[in-house]
Amino acid sequence: MKTYQFKPYNVGRWVIWSLFAIVLIFAPLVFTSNLSGTMLAQMGIAIIACLSYNILLGQGGMLSFGHAVYTGLGSFVAIHALNAITAGTSSIPVSLLPLIGGFAGIGFAVLLGYVTTKKSGTPFAMITLGVAELVFAMSLMFSEFFGGEAGISGNRVAGQTVWGISFGPQIQVYYLIAIYTFICVALMYAFTQTPLGRILNAVRDNPERVEFI
């Protein structure tokens, strides 16, 4: 009869994740100024962006100079979706806008990544740099989408409120970002434990051997 063995319960890992959640929950209650709230929200966004880049460079060993392109393009899609909600042409809840931006970023990454991943090493880095410069040049030409030098602004207090949450108070925006930050960090960690995540480590350490596997 076949028996299954499970990994031992990792107490330290649960402690770290619990502390991470506690910090996210209580940070705005400790740092209560408007500046602190803005900085905490931006830190949550930066955590997601930096850890995703760590998967690319730290786990896969691929130096990219165009990683911010996908974050930026996804953000522009999200702000256009927010303006559509404000105009009444869309009924998407504001709380789902980060998902829209995230999936838009994935779409652009698949489209541009199909070209950039044809090479590796220094050629890969130079291609990603070229993609970043191309998108920068496009931002000046397509002002309808990018908003030109002024960018695009929106009103986050739009659409129907859910459970009385309007995202008018800054703390509500922070907790929305904190929830997405925790979920994204957990998903990225889980990805590194999958076979595909392990293959990224192998590609980083010995790409020639991986080609023969």
Question: Where are the regions that the model predicts?
Answer:
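Transmembrane alpha-helices and adjacent helix-loop boundaries
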Residues: 1-213
